[in-house]
């Protein structure tokens, strides 16, 4: 829903569309963040507020087969779309005129890939909360190993991302007597690892 609002406010053409997309995303994101804050403010501090806070931290603690099946359709559909059309994502790195010469509708394809990615993200977040850094760290790691082609990066990111989450979730259950939310551990591990990747690629050199 938020993605549709961003595209609606950004428009479909004209100058500075990228800037409008970024600004629209910031505005919509800020609005929904304030709605979450309002929900926390009016929530029952004894019962509802801890559940909201724990969900925002991100964890696999409450996962079940029933919950997984409720979002599996969206996740699998999004993954299939990205895998089937991943070669077209490489074409988007070319100029718009060159992309059109391949018979690809630039705006339509971009919207389709964003919609597929958003469906996956929304389904996952609804089940286990906001677990960050995986979507930022793992694709960069895969690009270092397999190169820049999305033909290899997308499938490997899916596999390595799942393995990374399983490892961090297992560690979060074993480090202390009470389970640490997985998002805390992914941030503690992901932030320094991402800095190392930047340093290896020369991103921190002057």
Regions found by a protein language model. Give the residues of each.
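Alpha-helical transmembrane segments in inner-membrane proteins
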Residues: 1-206
